[in-house]
Structure formats: C-alpha cells, structure tokens
Amino acid sequence: MNRWPPILVPVITSFQDNGAIFSDGMKNVISFLYEHGITGIWLLGSYGSFPLLTNQERIVITTAALKHAKSLGMTTIVNVGTPSTALSIELARHAENEGADAVASVVPFYYASTHYRPENHLAFFEAIVKSVNIPVIFYNNADATGFSPPTAFIQQLTETGVAGLKDKGDFAAMSERCQAIRATNPDAIYLSGATSVHLQGYLVGANGVTSGTALATPALVTSLQKALEQGNIQEATRLQNLILKVRIAMGRY
C-alpha cells in the first residue's frame, strides 16, 4: 500500500486549562509537523489520550483535526477503538464522513484479556469493516489492552477485511506478524508501532512507523527514514541510537 506515507505521527490532544479541547492547539501541532516534512498523522491514539475522552470530544477533535490536515494534503488515520462495538462504529462512520483515509482500533479493552475469546475480537473488527468503505487497521497494543494476539488471529483478521496492522506488541516477533498480516493480503499495511524500532521494522518489511518522537524532533525521524530508503544502514543505525536517547529524555506520552 504505497499510498501510505512512511512516517505517521500520533498527534497529541491539546487541552485548555479548564479541560476543554483546544482545537487551535492541535491545528498548530499539525501545521508544525507539515512544515517539517511530515505528511501523515494518526489521530486519537495513546498520545491523543483517547481513553480519557468522551465520544463527543472525539468527534469534535476528529472534525477539526481532519479539516485542517486535509487542507494541507496530509494522510490521516483515526483511532476509533472503544470497548463498545456500536460506539466504535459510530466513530468510524464519522471519521469516514469527515474524510479520514483509514480508521484503526485496538481490541475492545477492559474485558479483552479476561472474558473475550479471539473470535469475539474478530467479530468486533468485522463489524467495523462492514460499517465503512475505508481501510480498517488493527492497532496491536498488548500492554494497554491485555490481549496479545497469536499469529493465527492476525491471519484471520485479514479474512474479515482488516487492511493492516499497527504493531506495538512483542518486538521480537515483528517479522512473524508482518508475514502473518500479509499471508492473505500481500498488500496489507504493516506499521511499526514505536520509533524505538523504526530501523528494525523497516528491515523486516514494514511500510512505515508511527512516531511519537517526531512530535518533538520530526527532522531526526525523517532523516532516519531517508537513510533507510538510501540503503545507508550505518547512518540509519546511528540515527536510531540517537532517537533512543531522545525517547528516554522525553519519556512515554
């Protein structure tokens, strides 16, 4: 899926002092990224504080951020994950209507690791796929959801129509999951879920990376991607190690 940019940046959600959504702040972040060579954004992920927001707040953010990003010609993916299939479908349809290029979702969390079986998660994603006419991406974040998908589950996801995988799981198995998501659909998108494995993901066949680090240092992340595309692994390794230091200094989220 070559239409996806190699770097997608998860935009932080901006708030006012009273806790209200600060849409202009988010627009400023998006403009900053665009001015520094970023052409794709990921909305309402972990950096976007999606578990802390009401559905109405997510709708407001999606509308404002997509309008601004699309005016700049940026590619947009919106996370619509919730514990409720109906609410996730509502968010997915809204994102599609506002011009999102794709939607994504984690598994329906809270009960994910204790009560749901893999077939329950498959049914959740199949329902979202059937509700929209844009690609649906599985956001694998086992640390947050408690569900670590087996390889067979990832292969079955593509059979439901899921178009790709953002992988923030066990990085030792990246190659295996990359192959699994493409077993049924060779064009399925595979995204490394963290800048810490940007280099490793590229080497196992990832289409790109979702990079929170690029919120602060977009030039550093785009330089790493350029080195990879030029086959300069020595320079890419140097930049990857530098990015690891930046990530430690920044902390998570």
Where are the regions that the model predicts?
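Catalytic alpha/beta core domains of metabolic enzymes, predominantly
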Residues: 127, 142-251
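Active-site beta->alpha loop and helix N-cap motifs at the rims of alpha/beta catalytic domains
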Residues: 2-148
